[in-house]
Amino acid sequence: MPAIISIVDVAKTYATGFQALKQVNLDIRRGEIFALLGPNGAGKTTLINVVCGIVRASAGKVSVDGHDNVTAWRAARALIGLVPQELTTDAFETVWATVSFSRGLFGYGPNPGHIEKVLKALSLWDKRNNKIMTLSGGMKRRVLIAKALSHEPRILFLDEPTAGVDVELRRDMWQLVRDLRETGVTIILTTHYIEEAEEMADRIGVISKGELILVEEKAELMRKLGRKQLTLQLHHKLQDIPAA
């Protein structure tokens, strides 16, 4: 089965000279949950923004379900839902209005039935007429997910989806991601937490200083992480192993 996202030799260098991405190559399988693991500043968000067409790569190529994200950007972007890390919403709009408006931005006509389905799936239906400024941080994050799903994308990017949320809401988010995958949505999430990647992902990629240094099936990576090794560096060569 061909990859739904193909990233080939992608690099990004900003005008300051900072190289955020270095020759990244990655294929995302259709229908999988892929976790991109790395510390702050590793390049996770930059890579997402390049794939989504928000940031232009300095080199390389990205295709989304066969559509080049530069020459066929509209078709590529229509397949993608993006949930940013920051809680960026219109505080004075209602939940229903902001989710419906997001659908229209992608050129889709009104579909109250779909919006209702999304809001109910995210436990937002009883908040549909509430202004976003009245919602908790966890509910605002759910609104961002609803906006990302408003135009029925086949790919969903979640940038640090559980950042700043409590343990209970984090587990609710994990279940939501699993439920979305069951509907056929391909999911790519970024995280700092190995336990989050272990809980949800089919495959895990590790990025550091702009380089994708590892891509593994989750089970294989967990097996490797389970092995412990201690290395001692000696100042002088030992002739014999000391007695205990």
Where are the regions a protein language model picked out?
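Catalytic Walker B motif of ABC-type/P-loop ATPase nucleotide-binding domains
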Residues: 156-159
